[in-house]
Amino acid sequence: MMSFLGRRAASLSRRALLGAAGCTLFLIGAPHRADAAEVKEVRLDWATYNPVSLVLKEKGFLEAALRERGIAVRWTQSLGSNKALEYLNGGAIDFGSSAGAAALLARVNGNPVKAIYAYSQPEWTALVTRKDSGIAKPADLKGKRIAVTRGTDPHIFLIRALQGAGLAERDAKLVLLQHADGRTALERGDVDAWAGLDPMMAASEIENGSVLFFRDPAANTWGVLDVREDFAKANPDLVRTVIAAYEEARTYAIANPDAVTRALVAATKLPEPVIARQLARTDLTRPAIGRVQAESIQAAGLALQQAGVIPPETNVASAVDGLIDTRFNPGPER
């Protein structure tokens, strides 16, 4: 996969995982909003795994677009796909950043989200270990302690890697932590491996000599922007406004990579070489959502179904069709 900067130069345990992906199905009193006339505030997340969201927040493109309509913008940080999907399901945000496969799991579990935009094509996850651990391949993880965040692309990546080695989750000892805590646990020696996520993964590589012992860019599902289905149905014009602002931010990011680096450094407090490593693995040039994303997400879904994570009676292809909504595409489907 060509990197973000390279493309600029060229073109300028089933229930547990499903529960984490869906998150909080029965939150009481959650402020779900369906009436367009009532919308006085659009609520989005920002995340260090979604560089475009940082540019959008910093530059104020959406605030400018909504100002004349008297609609405010509120930002909430998501620490992982699981958190973004939890916030969406609970009605705390209207738009959230997640991995495509994580969004599929959430929808299978009843979280009514639609994936409407591809903010990145990343290689943001891999399996990570210490350089002296003796772990060199997924088969070596049998009986080992692995830090992972349930309901996220790194978790799904781990399941698929274990599956490819003839192993299941039960053959290892999963330690459930948020991504940053997983890095800490690995470096302290509390776990043997970590299903990593950038930029924490890049930081562990550069600052602590951690080793990405298993990589598979094709098994990283796309970074997608999700919206609550009822919000999109009631407010299609606002969805288009958000996508247009995202496009403004994405175009700006490609033209101004130094600004993206500065925004990520400020948000993460990580040094520039770490952020450069993350961005080298991140392609921002394919925002239209469609066939390519569907194929990637469906492949992950079928693997998870084979592993027993998605129920056997679930029609994965139909679930993917229900997830991806191309109506708001900024350009042709890919």
Question: Residue locations for each model-derived region?
Answer:
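Secondary-structure end/capping motifs
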Residues: A234-P311
